[in-house]
């Protein structure tokens, strides 16, 4: 068991040595379905899969039947960063290397709610504060482990005009030396 832990730590070393972001990770279907179910589902809402990645669309093809659907996929000429439709729900797995830009664009689109499947390390107090200052609260969070993905992942759902379920402190504390 201990040897496995040491060998698996090579993942983090390999990530540190990357010269180019490797942001294409297909969301397992079961996880996409779990993420979708965390949302409030209302008839005729417009849902967006911001990075469909392929025609199978783990998210897009599993959105509820009673909603309208749209998608973006840069490889198919529909860039999320150029999207400007009125949207109710954004649900997807963003590229981690573009997280700040992604959050900024999501907030600009002003959905009723949005969810992200992200690495637990991507959920920072600074990002939560930015999202809260835009009028959203963290309403749901689910931690999970996806095989071959680095570390723990989490699904976070933010809702407009909702109080966050967590508290945080942005003060940096120092230990005595």
What is the predicted function of each stretch?
Residues 2-177:
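Class I S-adenosyl-L-methionine-dependent methyltransferase catalytic core
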């Amino acid at each position: 068991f201990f040897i496995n832990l040491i060998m698996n730590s090579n993942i983090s070393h390999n990530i540190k040595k990357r010269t180019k972001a490797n942001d294409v990770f297909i969301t397992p279907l079961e996880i996409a379905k779990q993420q979708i179910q965390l949302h409030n589902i209302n008839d005729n809402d417009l849902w967006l899969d911001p990075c469909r990645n392929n025609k199978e669309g783990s998210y897009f093809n599993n959105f509820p039947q009673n909603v309208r659907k749209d998608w973006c996929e840069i490889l198919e000429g529909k860039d999320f960063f150029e999207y400007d439709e009125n949207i109710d729900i954004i649900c997807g797995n963003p590229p981690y290397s573009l997280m700040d830009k992604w959050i900024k664009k999501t907030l600009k689109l002003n959905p009723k709610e949005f969810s992200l499947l992200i690495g637990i390390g991507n959920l920072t107090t600074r990002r939560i504060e930015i999202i809260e200052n835009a009028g959203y609260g963290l309403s749901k969070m689910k931690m999970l482990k996806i095989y071959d993905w680095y570390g723990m992942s989490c699904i976070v759902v933010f809702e407009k005009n909702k109080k966050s379920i967590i508290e945080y402190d942005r003060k940096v504390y120092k230990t005595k030396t």
